[in-house]
Amino acid sequence: MNRFTAYAALFFMFSLCSTAKEAGFLHPAFNFRGTSTMSASSGDYSAAPTPLYKSWALPSSLNLTTQPPPPLTDRSYYELVQALTSKMRLDCQTVGDMTWRHLSEMLFASWNSVKEVSLKAASVTLWAIINIWFGLYWTLARLITLFLWTFSIEALCLILLGCITSLIYKGALSLSEHLPVFLFMSPLKIIWRAAFSKRNYKNERAVEGYKGFSVPQKPPKSAVIELQHENGSHLGYANCIRLYSGENALVTAEHCLEGAFATSLKTGNRIPMSTFFPIFKSARNDISILVGPPNWEGLLSVKGAHFITADKIGKGPASFYTLEKGEWMCHSATIDGAHHQFVSVLCNTGPGYSGTGFWSSKNLLGVLKGFPLEEECNYNVMSVIPSIPGITSPNYVFESTAVKGRVFSDEAVKELEREASEAVKKLARFKSLTDKNWADDYDSDEDYGLEREAATNAPAEKTAQTNSAEKTAPSTSAEKTALTNKPLNGQAAPSAKTNGNSDIPDAATSAPPMDKMVEQIITAMVGRINLSEIEEKIVSRVSQKALQKPKQKKRGRRGGKNKQNSLPPTSTQSTSGAPKKEAAPQASGSAGTSRATTTPAPEAKPSGGKNSAKFTPSWRIKQQDSAGQKPDLKLNSKA
């Protein structure tokens, strides 16, 4: 039965398709709009879709007549099925739209409800958490307050014990972290130092085959001083130089600083080297430049000497000074060449010579380091002074020709300058953990404290005389010319020229203070000076010199004795031949401009005879006095 029904349905559909094809399936009359006004409930079947007619198929306006719609029975099955399908599709679309609209409204209302409920639930939950948390803290605070109020001493003890326990725990943790590394690395460091840190230099020895000589002679400007141990035994030497910053400094070998005392043979004073502040220190180059405490030059009775930096050292003869049986001896030496960052020197040295300076005339070249341990090296080495702008060299560039016969190349000089600059910057950035450097502890030294107290309590008269001499005498700084570098082996280094004003500024005005302690000491010392007493003494000395009668100088070419007689107002005419030249007071002289070089002027005459007079005397008629005689004109006799 089911199979028969299926076959009947297929036959019915095939018949419909055949009928539609025969009736003109693609005819324009069967192109429906897809809309209908038929209502299923009214039973009006005449409301079939209106076919679309093309413009050529429309009847003319004259033949239009109202015709009733054909009955449905005249339609084909295809048209009926098509109309039914369109109706069903439209009804389904309408029902679907209404269903979707109702579902959307329901979903939107449900979403709003769920959202409101969720927000309320979250708010209630958060406030519950806040209340519980705050309640816990409030309860805990009340309990702690009650506990501290009731058991104050016990609570304090517990807090201290807790802090101590925490510190012990942190210390144990840190120790457990670093102790294995320390135990592992310490033997490696010891092995490394023993294997690769062998010394390449020894401090002193005599050069084989070099025959030197020694003569008794004092160092230039007493610039070489002895370094001693704390017990007074000999240690080495140090040299005083004048820096371009205007300060005086000590230069010595770096290995001579530990436990050393700077000792003066003139004054007998001793100053520990720990009170000196290093402005340059290099263990690799074995040289140190140190600035001392206030008035250390006066305590040691030394003056700053000139020096030559590494970029200007040339080959040639040199000398160095040592102390033998309480007397200074000058020994010969020869600058031979370069040895790595040092200078090779041919000289005979012995134990205790370290730190002594090598001199070319009055210029310091460097300090003695020792001698290299290589087999082929038969000479000593000298540590040179690096060129540090503003400290050991000026900040400007010399406009001169290139230096001839230099020992170091440009690359070696630049390397020395770079190392010196890094060392100075490292010392400037150094700050102790206790905010107090080792150079600030010179007040705690008993020997130096007694020496400084004795120097401070010196007679005020000596200070007044020194100040008055500086006030009355003309400034000699303008009369001094810049010292040039002395020739070495016939080859001279370039010299800095001055224009009358010293290029080296005064230490009190240009040199920056070492630290606040030194500045306070200087301020206290200046505050102790009695300026009123000094001014009175200066005025008294100047007035005494102004009231003194100038002495008449003898003429070397005229002969005879010049007598200065006081004449009455009606004196006779003068027969001296020239008006008297009054001598200016000593304090009225002015400093003249200094020459730009130390070489003799081309117009200067050789020594051996006196220069002629700087003026030519001329005769003038003396005015007639009220009761005097008329002058007789006479000509001077030519000498």
Curated annotation (Swiss-Prot):
Its EC number is 3.4.21.-. GO terms for molecular function: RNA binding; serine-type endopeptidase activity; serine-type exopeptidase activity. Gene3D superfamilies: Trypsin-like serine proteases (2.40.10.10). The active site is at 255 (for protease activity), 286 (for protease activity), 354 (for protease activity). Residues 548-561 have a biased composition (Basic residues). Residues 463-488, 566-577 have a biased composition (Polar residues). The record marks 204-205, 399-400 as: Cleavage. It comes from the Viruses. GO terms for biological process: proteolysis; viral translational frameshifting. SUPFAM superfamilies: Trypsin-like serine proteases. Residues 1-20 form the signal peptide. One of its GO terms (cellular component) is membrane. Residues 207-399 form the Peptidase S39 domain. Specific enzymatic cleavages in vivo yield mature proteins. The protease probably cleaves itself and releases the VPg protein. The VPg protein is probably further cleaved in its C-terminus. The chain crosses the membrane at residues 121-141, 144-164, 172-192. Belongs to the peptidase S39B family. Precursor from which the VPg molecule is probably released at the onset of the RNA synthesis. Essential for virus replication. Participates, together with the proteins P0 and P7, in the inhibition of the induction of aphid-induced host phytohormones. This could play a role in the attraction to the infected plants by aphids. The C-terminus part of protein P1 and VPg/P1-C25 displays RNA-binding properties. This is Protein P1. It comes from Potato leafroll virus (strain Potato/Scotland/strain 1/1984).
